[in-house]
């Protein structure tokens, strides 16, 4: 277990999650002097220590209590869990929250010219993957017998190199598959980044710091999903407009100078289809509609 007085957090050193994790900490007000060559970094304004490691090492570091927190892709976390369960090893941790970045899917892909009729097409196929445990679980659920070929990188080249008949790999946009003459045919797992904590209780000071970080992370994510909306609204349409703009709390209503028929409305809304919403607001008689981004938010 970790004995340092600093809150120790494991992050991916390189790769798709690294920049997002760094940006999240920055948005949460954690000031860190990053040095690409150093594997340990320290916060300037909080008792926080960052360990920069390989992504597949993070679950084990949290399970064993070497670090207090870790940010990891759910796909890597569950792959490690399944492997440890198969070996009869103990798994203990707390999942604190799913984060709003690192989205991807684990998918089966085949040659783009091959006809696909369903998952039964993979019976007795050789499938190259870096996620053998997630693949095995999915295929067992579907009742499909197959042969797994473990590759830790460049999985997409396996079919053209004659190493496999198909692959099971992470997909974001699908551009890498297309570049290697493959097409996605089955999504077996959806993943995002998540924040996990070691199971053993933290000191009072460390837990208080974790709670502060969680509050800030929630504020950052809510701000990213929300907009601050200001508009002028007819008084007789307030009920309809309020229903159209679901807010975090009730809207603020202010009088307008020299206008007894309308009011100013301010609301923090999580409305997504906003061009359509603005058109509906205009139809209801709203005017001077302003939609502003929110940098930070504590609801």
Curated annotation (Swiss-Prot):
Keywords: Amino-acid biosynthesis, ATP-binding, Cytoplasm, Glycosyltransferase, Histidine biosynthesis, Magnesium, Metal-binding, Nucleotide-binding, Transferase. It catalyses: 1-(5-phospho-beta-D-ribosyl)-ATP + diphosphate = 5-phospho-alpha-D-ribose 1-diphosphate + ATP. One of its GO terms (cellular component) is cytoplasm. Its cofactor is Mg(2+). Feedback inhibited by histidine. NCBIfam families: hisG, HisG_C-term. Its main location: cytoplasm. GO terms for biological process: L-histidine biosynthetic process. This is ATP phosphoribosyltransferase. GO terms for molecular function: ATP binding; ATP phosphoribosyltransferase activity; magnesium ion binding. Its EC number is 2.4.2.17. It is found in: Cytoplasm. Belongs to the ATP phosphoribosyltransferase family. Long subfamily. Gene3D superfamilies: 3.30.70.120, Periplasmic binding protein-like II (3.40.190.10). Pathway: Amino-acid biosynthesis; L-histidine biosynthesis; L-histidine from 5-phospho-alpha-D-ribose 1-diphosphate: step 1/9. Catalyzes the condensation of ATP and 5-phosphoribose 1-diphosphate to form N'-(5'-phosphoribosyl)-ATP (PR-ATP). Has a crucial role in the pathway because the rate of histidine biosynthesis seems to be controlled primarily by regulation of HisG enzymatic activity. It comes from Actinobacillus pleuropneumoniae serotype 5b (strain L20).
